Swiss-Prot record:
This is Probable D-serine dehydratase. One of its GO terms (biological process) is isoleucine biosynthetic process. HAMAP family: D_Ser_dehydrat (MF_01030). It comes from the Bacteria. Its EC number is 4.3.1.18. The modification N6-(pyridoxal phosphate)lysine is found at K111. Pfam families: PALP (PF00291). It catalyses: D-serine = pyruvate + NH4(+). PANTHER family: D-SERINE DEHYDRATASE, THREONINE DEHYDRATASE, MITOCHONDRIAL-RELATED. Keywords: Lyase, Pyridoxal phosphate.
Amino acid sequence: MPVGRSLSLDPNLLAQLQSHSPTLWLNPHQGMPLPDFAPTAADLADADARLRRCAGLLAELFAELRPSGGLIASPLQPAEPLKRAARAGHAQAGAWYVKRDDALPVAGSIKARGGFHEVLALAESIAERHGLAGADTDRRALASGAARARFARHTVMVGSTGNLGLSIGMLASALGFRTVAHMSADAKAWKKARLRTRGVEVVEHAGDYAKAVDAGRRQAAGMPCCHFVDDEGSRMLFLGYATAAAELAAQLAQAGRPVDARHPLFVHLPCGVGGAPGGIVYGLKALYGEHVHAFVAEPTASPCVLVQLAGDAAHPRSVYDIGLDNRTEADGLAVAQASPLAAALLRAQAAGAFTVDDRQLFAHLLDARERLGIDLEPSAAAAFGGPAWIAGSDAGRAYLRGRGIDPDAATHVIWATGGSLVPAQEHRRFQAHARAQRQVGGAGA
């Protein structure tokens, strides 16, 4: 049986994916009922409240967070220069913005939202269990000597391609936890070095993301007082990402961009295992319902969420099942199999997915530098082609027509997910590579 035949994928879609051709896929399941395990409104409110009551603690632990009072928040940057540079005139509709999670302090990526939330939830739970904090206790008490001594008896463990490990490692070690990060072969050397300077134990693996996560999960299962941050199934991570929705809503209101039937919101999100985009989409759907249209962006070598959503929902599927190799410069998105939690929720809520090859990643990275003055890592540039896919492709235009959407009335938010902590020499290498490829032919849209 040919590779991929048993996955219930449309043959044309399968052929496009196997040829590494950048593709826009529209989700026919959008609008289906949410699964029974979907988070509740109370869950979302609890996560937001946790981050707010712990803001003072974060500001005390990290000087970089003092200007925001300890809140995890990033700017919303207008992207008109990027819009004007779009290749096709018909792709220049609507208002474009970039959500700058690449600039999030301390962790330098979108993973600060979910990672910090999970570590804070763990710290609160331990402190309350041992009488170190109550419901009304100032959370700065979690940085006390007594709290640190208690946390030092516990281990926090995570499996990561890089950015989640940074997020978990930075906060857990700052609170006094013993911290272990299992890192895949895709993880960049500078990320591992940064963790080690913070006292985090880094365990390097020759295999991919899934193998690093599995190794961490198995080690944690045999250890007392060990909390494993499971990127493939953590509700705490998911809810932390979901809190970004209210932040974005306030920024759009301040920018004078309504979100309603006449003024739809399109959000374009880089996607690895699916937790971060899944959480953000879930939060936005809770606020805006059908008026938000979310598209996830994945490497052509690693479209794990697209494969899961387009195939049989009953069984987990891997990009290896369709003959792809999961090898990409987008290290943060080099994931072969989607999170079951995120995939089930995205199946009901995502508008679709599109894929981007490495040449396009570097072209978008260079556009971000030259048009907007933003230095990104390759994975963070994955979603920059989203607006052009919607307004400039046959499938995208069909999506707009089918919903009676006026492209000029839409707001497009492109999520930039990481880059501010990348060493300067790495940024120079990225940009030199992008300029070299542009000289020999550039990249497609």
